[in-house]
Structure formats: C-alpha cells, structure tokens
Amino acid sequence: MLSVGDNAPEFNLNDQDGKLVQLSDFKGKKLVIYFYPKDQTPGCIKEACSFRDNIESYKKHDIAVLGVSIDSEKSHQNFMSKQELNFPLLADVEKEMVNSYEVWGEKSMYGRKYMGTFRKTFLINETGSIDKIYEKVKVATHAEDVLTDWEIS
C-alpha cells in the first residue's frame, strides 16, 4: 500500500491531446495528481472546476496539476472543452496508473458492486516522494484544501 514518504510510482500516459506525460517531467516541481471516476459526472465536474478556478495559485507557486481517469483522450477533450479546464487530463484506458497508485477496485452503489476508480489525490514533492494522500475528498473545495495543506493559500 502506498504511504506518505514513498516514491510516487512512475507513469507514462497520454494527455487529452495525445502528448506523452511522465512523472519524470515534473522532477524539481511539486505535483498534484488527482484521480476521479468519470468525465462529465456531477462530482467530477465540481472537483475539476475547483482546480480550474484555482489554477493560477498553483502556477504562481510552480505546482503542476494532473487529473487522471480511465476515460479516453477524446472524452477528456470534450470534458476540457465543456468545462473550460486549464490543466492536463491523463487517459489511463489500460488502467496502468490507477493500479500502480492503488485507486482501482471494487466499489458499491445502491447495493450493486462494480469495479471503478476511487476519488483520491496524491501530493508529490520536488524529489518525487508522496507528501500527502487524500483518501476522502470534498469535491467543491478540494483545490483550496490542497493549497491550504501545502500552506500556499
């Protein structure tokens, strides 16, 4: 199980435009990686828009933000366009990253069990270690909560 202090697992995924993005691209920089279940769903829209609305504070402090789901590049393009998102979304269609970050598993809704992505966020420091893991997220204020925890707000 991933814990604070562990090295963040490497990843190599395409963003919404088909550009390869890797953990090593962010060496020397703080990074927020937030995993979410599905493009264009109510909670995911609120969370993404929270980061969108706070992205200038992140940029000002040289912090990158990545959203990750198992949706396709095309789905991400549509999501970004509709919500006017201003940070990359990674397409983990093969479920490599959701598995390496341990956010893929059995979920339950209305008594029905299914496999899906848990809403979870990782704060990665400049050396590539995990500074914090958010197991529970308040979608509407999550971006502000991260800034507060990194003492940036």
Spans of features found by a protein language model:
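Chalcogenol-based redox active-site neighborhoods
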Residues: 1-153
